[in-house]
Amino acid sequence: MAKEIKFSEEARRAMLRGVDKLADAVKVTLGPKGRNVVLEKKFGSPLITNDGVTIAKEIELEDPFENMGAKLVAEVASKTNDVAGDGTTTATVLAQAMIREGLKNVTAGANPMGIRKGIEKAVAVAVEELKAISKPIKGKESIAQVAAISAADEEVGQLIAEAMERVGNDGVITLEESKGFTTELDVVEGMQFDRGYVSPYMITDTEKMEAVLENPYILITDKKISNIQDILPILEQVVQQGKPLLIIAEDVEGEALATLVVNKLRGTFTAVAVKAPGFGDRRKAMLEDIAILTGGEVISEELGRDLKSTTIASLGRASKVVVTKENTTIVDGAGDSERIKARINQIRAQLEETTSEFDREKLQERLAKLAGGVAVIKVGAATETELKERKLRIEDALNSTRAAVEEGIVAGGGTALMNVYNKVAAIEAEGDEATGVKIVLRAIEEPVRQIAQNAGLEGSVIVERLKTEKPGIGFNAATGEWVDMIEAGIVDPTKVTRSALQNAASVAAMFLTTEAVVADKPEENKGGNPGMPDMGGMM
């Protein structure tokens, strides 16, 4: 495949056209008066959304050089979404502003490496200052405000705040599509882990493709079960009780799996097998968690327990277990509350000691599963198109709220970025480095300017006034008033604002230091297929 190469100014200009096309499509959604974007779907109804990352991912441009520029900015939105779960439109607006300003200076002869240093310096100062002005989130009301701003819907804010109150900040909150018009909250007390049934023949509800076990016994082991003789004694005891059985094991295969499936199909008894969650030592810990929650024991040779000699007393109990293709939820485990409390305290102690980010995340998950439960927000709407749009909004709001709980909140509506303006402006830098700082200064005005423009106002007027206002005072584009943003409940999670700025700067710096771009040369279309006979006379 032949390649086409463009250099320096020509390359950057072509990529900038792509950046502008993508960013212009995304930034119309910013702020309380932002509009929606309609995305064509090959199948089904079009998707209407105001979610930056969803729009960015859909955009493919014909010109390969423009497309590369667009893809770079889509990466900003995508990375911000991965880290903070929201703020993707802000990140796109910041990236476009930095790239545009930077390109002007590079064209005028500035050194891209010097500019890059300046950008990095300015962003580091801005991030430190954002952390300094960040306020911790307190109470249900603050949580509701963050969620309501993100979803542009107060009702959603209340729902998410209630969900977090019910299952705790550590709890698991999932989204489902409701059959009706209303959006409601359903709290499932219980533990969920990401392992589904070993065989689809084990399902009890063919419509939902899930296995629902009422009052089951739960066998928990770290062994691989392939020989039916290993579990025959315990199966016989469970069958006598007339209750279903959930088997959590390293794996269930071969003869053992075949026997369980055949008996399920014949209606002799119901047993569902799932693989144990996690790996290595983490798996042992999670199995122990499940055992404590359900009042059972982990059948492990390390602990001197053998499958063949297991009695019904070693099995856990729960009022209900739901197993889907991907997840298992244990509801209302019959474990001793004192033992569960002790286990929770043990995990909390480990959380305080750990230095690894990954371990912390996994311990948080385990804590959530033991301490809280699972809250399900059932999203309802009149049409499928509205349902998809609403679901995306609520997903963003949920991520936003979690980010706020983690790192606190700052004034919303782009005000927080303007509040760090003076600190960034005070950076001592010379030459091209100073130019890099100025680029960031110009970029951090952009979200406020865009929010005002989307509300039909002159952005520059709002930006200039904001520079003279006290910190925390900002422009409420929804009402057209100047207010104390945090008091008015217009807040953004610090993590979202920080991630948007850092990711935008990272991609802008890469963009400005680009000197050559290589793309596939489009193939010449030679017209119709050769050798096709004349179709004359065919009806």
UniProtKB/Swiss-Prot annotation:
Keyword set, alphabetical order: ATP-binding, Chaperone, Cytoplasm, Isomerase, Nucleotide-binding
GO MF term list: ATP binding; ATP-dependent protein folding chaperone; isomerase activity; unfolded protein binding
UniProt xrefs under InterPro entries: Chaperonin_Cpn60_CS, Cpn60/GroEL, Cpn60/GroEL/TCP-1, GroEL-like_apical_dom_sf, GROEL-like_equatorial_sf, TCP-1-like_intermed_sf
Gene3D superfamilies (alphabetical): GroEL (3.50.7.10), GroEL-like equatorial domain (1.10.560.10), TCP-1-like chaperonin intermediate domain (3.30.260.10)
Residues that hold ATP according to the record: T29, L30, G31, P32, D86, G87, T88, T89, T90, G413, N476, A477, A478, D492
Enzyme class: isomerase
Record's subcellular location: Cytoplasm
A Pfam family this chain is assigned to: Cpn60_TCP1
CDD domains found in the cross-reference section: GroEL
Any single GO BP term: protein refolding
EC assignment: 5.6.1.7
GO cellular component entries: cytoplasm
Range of residues in the leader sequence: none
Catalytic reactions on record: ATP + H2O + a folded polypeptide = ADP + phosphate + an unfolded polypeptide
Protein family membership: Belongs to the chaperonin (HSP60) family.
Subunit structure: Forms a cylinder of 14 subunits composed of two heptameric rings stacked back-to-back. Interacts with the co-chaperonin GroES.
Function: Together with its co-chaperonin GroES, plays an essential role in assisting protein folding. The GroEL-GroES system forms a nano-cage that allows encapsulation of the non-native substrate proteins and provides a physical environment optimized to promote and accelerate protein folding.
Protein name: Chaperonin GroEL
Species name: Geobacillus sp. (strain WCH70)
